[in-house]
Regions:
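Pre-Walker A (Motif I) flank of P-loop NTPase domains
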Residues: 2-11, 97
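Glycine-rich phosphate-binding P-loop
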Residues: 8-21
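Short beta-strand-centered segment that lines the nucleotide-binding/catalytic pocket of NTP-utilizing
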Residues: 30-41
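ATP-dependent small-molecule kinase phosphotransfer cores
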Residues: 41-98
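Small-molecule kinase domains that catalyze NTP-dependent phosphoryl transfer to phosphate-bearing small molecules
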Residues: 59-66, 139-184
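Short, amphipathic alpha-helical "lid/cap" segments that border enzyme active or binding sites
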Residues: 87, 183-191
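RNA pseudouridine synthases
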Residues: 93, 106-112
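Conserved phosphate-donor/acceptor-positioning beta-strand/loop module used by diverse small-molecule
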Residues: 112-134, 140-148
């Protein structure tokens, strides 16, 4: 069966976002990443700026802070409301047509669909570090810190909301090392596997 929806989860610095965008161009399908923030904000009633800062990375302050966080009348925290709005937007996008969606626990949210190709992009530390240094104009120490912090927040969010382990191979159809394969080959593999 052809896979009309491609989800891409990735380690920070692995080039997963770039690879996803190129795959969407090659297939001539929609690409969703940060461009869905306004839809999530609208569904949650929160500002796009708040969503930008928190949607994929909450509960960023840890489980104790999450447990002590304020809740609405239904018992949902702000993080839960953001996640629920994000889930609804992703389900709507999947119904609209073929697309590539980056991050946001999309592999888990769409797990019951047969037409989804779930991809995890990872890379080797030296290559990821150099990419972050180039893209963000930071030194090596800051690049390593950014990588560790971002991946930890992605992992915490994913593990919390999915009850699964972020980056675990069995959660994905494909796991690709962009450092060893290169971006172009990763793109070609994903395109081929989507057919």
């Amino acid at each position: 069966m052809a896979k009309r929806i491609i989800t891409i989860s990735r380690e920070f610095g692995s080039g997963g976002r770039f690879i996803g965008e190129e795959v969407a161009k090659k297939l001539g399908i929609a690409y969703y990443d940060k461009n869905i923030i306004s839809e999530i904000a609208e569904k949650s009633g929160l500002s796009p700026e708040y969503i930008q800062e928190n949607a994929e990375l909450s509960p960023k302050k840890g489980l104790l802070a999450y447990a002590l966080a304020g809740r609405d009348i239904t018992g949902k925290s702000v993080e839960d409301m953001v996640y629920e709005a994000q889930r609804k937007v992703i389900l709507d996008l999947a119904e609209k047509g073929p697309c590539v969606i980056i991050g946001r626990n999309t592999d888990y949210i769409l797990k019951d669909r047969d037409d989804v190709l779930n991809v995890f992009i990872h890379g080797d530390m030296p290559e990821k570090t150099q990419r972050i240094i180039r893209l963000y104009n930071v030194d090596e120490k800051e690049a390593v810190k950014m990588m560790a912090d971002t991946d930890k927040r992605h992992m915490t969010n994913y593990n919390f909301y999915t009850d699964q382990k972020w980056g675990k191979a069995s959660n994905y159809t494909l796991c690709l090392n962009s450092s060893q394969l290169g971006y172009d080959r990763c793109e070609k593999i994903i395109v081929e596997c989507s057919k």
